[in-house]
Design a protein with these regions (language model features):
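Alpha-helix N-cap/helix-start motif at helix boundaries, enriched for small hydrophobics
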Residues: 2-7, 119
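Conserved tyrosine-mediated DNA breakage-rejoining catalytic core shared by Y-recombinases
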Residues: 6-58
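Short functional hotspots where side chains directly engage DNA or cofactors
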Residues: 16-21, 97, 108, 120-138, ...
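DNA/chromatin major-groove-contacting recognition/catalytic segments
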Residues: 26, 30-36, 114, 133-152
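Short, basic (Lys/Arg/His-rich) helix/loop patches that form interaction surfaces
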Residues: 46, 54, 61-75, 81-121, ...
């Protein structure tokens, strides 16, 4: 959540369809504080699709006198959690934690053939092993795929 809340409009590259993740947001002694990410590999540039870019552009277009240095999401972690809980209740689905969205995103990419090394970089994991430890259960069909390749 901290990486998301630290994003500014300057971090978005509409031409190259990327977002630069280069800082983290925290509340320290009731103050909004921007810090460096946890690890060097947490600093990264990720590709995003047109849907994400259009949402950010709409936020820019509807903001009051926006500046590139403005936060894209000026809400609290608590507010995000509350809004997600409300959405889940309205949709009559089990409660989802914000981190579950990250996990679902990673699982979706991995199950659709995205290389584990690429995924690890996207997530900002310091070691690929971390990504493997969390997501290796997503690839149960890998043995079948291996057999298909070998049988060609």
């Amino acid at each position: 959540i901290g990486e998301l809340l630290a994003l500014t409009f300057a971090d978005v590259d509409f031409e190259n369809k990327t977002i630069s993740i280069n800082k983290n947001f925290q509340i320290v002694k009731n103050e909004r504080v921007i810090t460096d990410p946890k690890t060097p590999k947490s600093k990264r540039v990720i590709a995003v699709n047109d849907i994400v870019l259009n949402c950010i552009k709409e936020m820019w277009d509807t903001a009051y006198k926006p500046k590139k240095t403005d936060a894209i999401f000026y809400v609290s972690k608590y507010s995000l959690k509350r809004q997600l809980d409300t959405a889940c209740r309205r949709a009559k689905v089990p409660r989802i934690r914000i981190h579950d969205l990250r996990h679902s995103h990673a699982s979706y990419l991995l199950s659709n053939g995205i290389n584990i090394v690429i995924l690890s970089r996207r997530l900002g994991h310091e070691k690929v092993q971390t990504t493997l430890n969390i997501y290796c259960h997503i690839c149960p069909s890998s043995e079948d795929r291996l057999n298909d390749v070998l049988n060609k």
